[in-house]
């Protein structure tokens, strides 16, 4: 009798290196570092957004964010609103955009009133003992200033959108 050599292969799944890991190995923090969010180009882009620029006052941050949102929120109301095929489409769309800016301003102020009920007096220090200044936006006064800037910027963005719809010759 001849004996055949048989070889059996078993695949074993070893420890795979994880690309996405929770911060400090604690999955309950709820903030995951991904290759996208931890990439230098993405972190530079995010740090240049108006909400994260710490060198700018909260009022100016709110104006900048409000201008962009007010300008872009009026367009869908003009082109997709119920009065889109009438002569009053621009006026109705811009008034609807202004109404949405007012509603979002109320939402921002409600968020600020609930999120920043108490201001922590405890300062943050680095390992060398140097004091780290807090972002002024992360306080009730800073958030109120941001909300005021948002309102002014948002309504200005809607007004700018209306002016452009009336002035640009190729709009209609």
Question: Each predicted region: which residue ranges?
Answer:
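Short, charged cytosolic
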Residues: 21-41
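Mature, well-folded catalytic/scaffold domains that follow N-terminal targeting or propeptide regions
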Residues: 33-40, 59-60, 68, 101, ...
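Membrane-interacting alpha-helical segments
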Residues: 81-172
């Amino acid at each position: 009798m001849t004996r055949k050599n048989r070889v059996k292969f078993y695949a074993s799944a070893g420890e795979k290196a994880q690309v996405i890991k929770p911060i400090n190995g604690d999955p309950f923090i709820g903030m995951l570092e991904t290759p996208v969010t931890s990439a230098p180009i993405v972190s530079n882009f995010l740090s240049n957004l108006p909400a994260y620029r710490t060198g700018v006052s909260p009022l100016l941050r709110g104006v900048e964010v409000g201008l962009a949102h007010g300008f872009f929120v009026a367009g869908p109301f003009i082109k997709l609103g119920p009065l889109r095929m009438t002569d009053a489409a621009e006026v109705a769309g811009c008034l609807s955009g202004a109404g949405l800016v007012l509603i979002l301003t109320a939402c921002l102020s409600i968020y600020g009133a609930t999120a920043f009920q108490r201001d922590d007096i405890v300062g943050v220090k680095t390992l060398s003992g140097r004091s780290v200044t807090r972002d002024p936006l992360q306080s009730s006064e800073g958030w109120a200033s941001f909300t005021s800037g948002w309102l002014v910027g948002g309504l200005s963005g809607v007004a700018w959108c209306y002016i452009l719809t009336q002035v640009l010759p190729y709009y209609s």
